[in-house]
Amino acid sequence: MNVQEQGFPLDLGASFTEDAPRPPVPGEEGELVSTDSRPVNHSFCSGKGTSIKSETSTATPRRSDLDLGYEPEGSASPTPPYLRWAESLHSLLDDQDGISLFRTFLKQEGCADLLDFWFACSGFRKLEPCDSNEEKRLKLARAIYRKYILDSNGIVSRQTKPATKSFIKDCVMKQQIDPAMFDQAQTEIQSTMEENTYPSFLKSDIYLEYTRTGSESPKVCSDQSSGSGTGKGMSGYLPTLNEDEEWKCDQDADEDDGRDPLPPSRLTQKLLLETAAPRAPSSRRYNEGRELRYGSWREPVNPYYVNSGYALAPATSANDSEQQSLSSDADTLSLTDSSVDGIPPYRIRKQHRREMQESIQVNGRVPLPHIPRTYRMPKEIRVEPQKFAEELIHRLEAVQRTREAEEKLEERLKRVRMEEEGEDGEMPSGPMASHKLPSVPAWHHFPPRYVDMGCSGLRDAHEENPESILDEHVQRVMRTPGCQSPGPGHRSPDSGHVAKTAVLGGTASGHGKHVPKLGLKLDTAGLHHHRHVHHHVHHNSARPKEQMEAEVARRVQSSFSWGPETHGHAKPRSYSENAGTTLSAGDLAFGGKTSAPSKRNTKKAESGKNANAEVPSTTEDAEKNQKIMQWIIEGEKEISRHRKAGHGSSGLRKQQAHESSRPLSIERPGAVHPWVSAQLRNSVQPSHLFIQDPTMPPNPAPNPLTQLEEARRRLEEEEKRANKLPSKQRYVQAVMQRGRTCVRPACAPVLSVVPAVSDLELSETETKSQRKAGGGSAPPCDSIVVAYYFCGEPIPYRTLVRGRAVTLGQFKELLTKKGSYRYYFKKVSDEFDCGVVFEEVREDEAVLPVFEEKIIGKVEKVD
């Protein structure tokens, strides 16, 4: 039966047509049971017989492709098409009506080319790449490029990245047509639609009006403007009847007349509530395993839940009569032939599961094929070309300035070396002239840290270095309590030490027997004073002079193995005025503030201030040199008298014991010059008054017998003190002894933490050599070997501890890394087959077990 466009009779049975939608099945009131993509909307008369235009409705179940002409009840899709459009963009583009409605919306917004380009790319990709379609594919690619990509003012061109457009242009120009050449552009346009146009479409008036007129309305008769502007529109579903009432067409029409009509295109809260659930994600809408009971559309809904997407089901899924029956437990549900009263709720959950699976299939698919590696887009330039160019130019200019500065510094150093070599040739000639220091490379030939250390940080590094102050204090208190402390107050000023070294090198012509030693000292170190050699000869009188000199050379060269030029550097008075100039070690040995090269620099600096300045006469230098050499001669005489007198084997043993217990002046880290780094512990400055005041005569030479007696007394006191010291002080003393006996290389980096005991203790060979050198005068130290594995390390740490009974507290003092540890020590035990166990010791007063004359432990960190 066809739909009548004229007025219907008032008979209730005559107004019911066969193509009208049926009421929902009990238990599925919240679901819409229509999926027809081309619905038909039926208009009912108001009882006056006025003609109205009929419109298509989405709620009709009639389908022309079925055998019966309509879908059997219960077999319809769970949701209508216009509700599936809100699930994803692909659901919208898979439906013809959705495409048409979406295109209409895009035309209103002025961006319909986005949808056309998307479909053009999809059609181009579906063309098979065969020889017959090659020309067709080329023409289609050119057409798509010219219409959408080439036009820079078009919406597609503006939404496509420059790299993508250049890639498509290259493919078209080179005629390298590939099915995936537009895939990247299609992906970008699709992202634009999903982020901008598609959400706007779901909130637009055209979509809301479509869903309102095409679905069940909460009102019985909704006001709708027809084509002629007359008549009332009504949704396709039959009106809901209250209990104990009959439906009357006139009654509903009268009720509609009393209501305020709403404009069809107006976006109201009621329309948003009706479409809230379809627009919400399916994962939020449904909760598997939970029974949902939908409330009435008349119930107020909190806007917070509506806006967040957690709204209830659409208002069209509830009926007042059904809701009342559910609340009163009355068996008055509307039943059909295929429905069962009291349907169990598990069918609702099953339907929800089916909808979730369908949503996964729709939203989880990948519409675009995989892009091969050869066709991928080039990486996007993340920095703007102008900014990149500015930054590159700035860096290149900085590199250029650095190189120019290095070249200028190189030229200045070359000029300084040439001038110094020229003035060195004008030095006074004599027997000492043949012992001139060899030429050494300049500062810039070494790593920058040594250069900076030598040039800028050497002057006041000693005063500011706490390690040097601590070493001086410990050495004064614990090693030499009776001697004068080599503190900062006993160091000579800058104008003394280097100047006297230079004078010493230039005025030793009258004493030939001192020339080899003095020349050797100057050639090797350039900074050591002659008293070092005197002290060394005094304690080695039983050995030949050649052997002594060879040993001195070996010790000094080993301590300065990396080069003598980095041991010290004098800053001339004109340093700030002659920036960039640097003195070499040769100049340092022969010059200070009163030597020839320094005089030349001072003359350069003061030439602008006083042009008539005169160089000091050399007579004063000669007098000073004479006094120094006289002091050296007196010291040598004392040595010769001591050698002739002799003191027997006991005296020799005392000397050797004193030598082994008190390290040489070369090895002992004493006070260093203010402009020498604190790491140069080898350079010892004598504290004689004649260095501070050149006019004062030197001190008389010390008596060797007195020195030997003093050395023996100190050795005895040291042994007594060592036995009474606690373990921590003995550890500090052992570390200090190790630091004195082992010569550290110059300019070595200062340790920020105390190293491990095993790295600082003496090895067995060194201990044996010391005992042998001592001649057996000192009693052997009763000590025990302590070895421990620290935190699972494969190599143990080994050290010597005085005494046979070692407690856990003493053992903890050996560990330099403090923390929470557990301590296990190896001992003999018959408890297990292996015969040994690692026993845990926790008390600090507990004595550690001894295994094979050793204490073997394991230190494990507590997690």
From Swiss-Prot:
Interaction with beta-catenin as annotated region, ranges: 433-501
Amino acid composition bias (Acidic residues), ranges on this chain: 249-258
Cell location: Cytoplasm; Nucleus; Cell membrane; Membrane
Post-translational modification Phosphoserine, affected residues: 75, 77, 217, 468, 485, 492, 509
Region (Interaction with GSK3B): 348-432
Region entry Interaction with TP53, spans: 209-338
GO cellular component: beta-catenin destruction complex; cell cortex; cytoplasm; cytoplasmic vesicle; cytosol; lateral plasma membrane; microtubule cytoskeleton; nucleolus
Protein's UniProt keywords contain Cell membrane: yes
Region (Disordered): 1-81, 215-240, 249-268, 315-344, 529-624, 642-664
Quaternary data: Homodimer. Component of the beta-catenin destruction complex, containing at least CTNNB1, an axin and GSK3B, that regulates CTNNB1 protein levels through phosphorylation and ubiquitination. Interacts with GSK3B; the interaction hyperphosphorylates CTNNB1 leading to its ubiquitination and destruction. Interacts with DAXX; the interaction stimulates the interaction of DAXX with TP53, stimulates 'Ser-46' phosphorylation of TP53 and induces cell death on UV irradiation. Also interacts with APC, RNF111, SMAD6 and SMAD7.
DIX domain sequence ranges: 781-863
Region (Interaction with RNF111): 505-758
Protein name as it appears in the record: Axin-1
Keywords: ADP-ribosylation, Apoptosis, Cell membrane, Cytoplasm, Developmental protein, Isopeptide bond, Membrane, Nucleus, Phosphoprotein, Tumor suppressor, Ubl conjugation, Wnt signaling pathway
Residue ranges with Polar residues bias: 34-61, 575-584
Sites bearing Phosphothreonine, chain numbering: 480
Composition bias type Low complexity, residue spans: 325-339
Modified how: Phosphorylation and dephosphorylation of AXIN1 regulates assembly and function of the beta-catenin complex. Phosphorylated by CK1 and GSK3B. Dephosphorylated by PPP1CA and PPP2CA. Phosphorylation by CK1 enhances binding of GSK3B to AXIN1. Also phosphorylated by CDK2 which regulates interaction with CTNBB1.
Region of interest called Interaction with HIPK2, as start-end residue ranges on this chain: 678-753
Keyword DNA repair included in the entry's annotation: no
Protein source organism: Mus musculus
Annotated spans, Interaction with PPP2CA: 572-790
Segments passing through the bilayer: none
Compositionally biased spans, kind Basic residues: 529-542
Annotated InterPro entries: Axin-like, Axin_b-cat-bd, Axin_TNKS-bd, DIX, DIX_dom_sf, RGS, RGS_sf, RGS_subdom1/3
A Pfam family it matches: DIX
